Amino acid sequence: GLFIPCYVDALYPEVGVATYKLLTSLGLDVTYPLKQTCCGQPMANAGFEKMATDISRHFDDLFKEFDYVVAPSASCAAFVKFYHPRLAKGNHECLTSKKTMDVVEFLHDVVKPTSLKAHFPHIVSVHNSCHGVRELGLSSPSERQVPQFNKIIDLLKLVDGITIREPERKDECCGFGGMFSVEEPDVS
């Protein structure tokens, strides 16, 4: 099942469309449940635990039959994966948390493409999101002394013509922080 987070739906709908097109171009059977809403993270972050719990239950009911739940958002995928079970508190099964993945994680670890039908003759910079790095393990965090890896760059290297340049501080916080950037733009 394809989960399009509320902020993607409202602010960046082209990302949802591009995710759908990418997955189907790889021959995957993609379903977009029309009754999806949100993962509940904005409500949980604002302290509305009951509302977040109700949303997580709806999410689980909507996506539990799928083999995978794929989202173009590391933050939302991480929230479903790690926080939905906490919200459930044993009151419902929370079947989706183990099968929810960010689109990069899904492509890199499950689909494992060896080529992409894409040509992009441009220089791109890759900034790794905090949730992607530290919760989902999409790349190695710079503050830890571990072997370097980057699943995003591994996938981008499959695109013909692309040149990848990482910024000097490639995984330092960008300030977005989900709703924090909307509610506190000057601090963010």
Q: Across the structure, where does each feature detected by a protein language model lie?
A:
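Iron-sulfur cluster-binding electron-transfer modules in prokaryotic oxidoreductases
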Residues: 1-188
